[in-house]
Amino acid sequence: YVAVQRDNWWEWNYNLELRLRISNQLFFTPSWDQRFQNNSEGYAVPFGEPADTSNAIIFGNRDRNTSTLSLGLDYTITNRLGLTFKLRHYNSKISYNYFNELLSSGRLNRLDEYSGLDDTGVSAYDNNYNAFTIDLFFRWVFLPGSELNLVWKNSIFTEDSFVNDPYWNTLGNTLN
């Protein structure tokens, strides 16, 4: 558990991890990591086309919710051969509260008239980013200090503006 507070910006996170030795050869590690940031400041990247445009460098005050679900499986064939399988889903949702322009002095000036909405009234900045990755490792120690690793990786990335969708809906949309 970690908690940080600065001015009106606060964040905290927690991590749950279970380590299960199923047999002498099989080891299973599921984990869940959750991070919450409220009123954080950061560079605002539009993912849509905002109706109002600005020539200024835009920073945003935003809330960010990040979840990571991981499943790991280690299988030891012999003391020199092993397989490792890792499955991971990373989800980060960013909702903007208001926007600022970066001044030449390095300070931020609040833009009350800038909403960041597109022509349909939807935020051009809110973002729901997902990464689903699968990793498979084969390790062979053929001499002391010498090993061969074969690695296979695959990934799916999605991005949309549905920041209010529940986690399991977001995961389902990523896999479809």
Regions found by a protein language model. Give the residues of each.
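Exposed, low-structure sequence patches enriched in small/polar residues
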Residues: 1-176
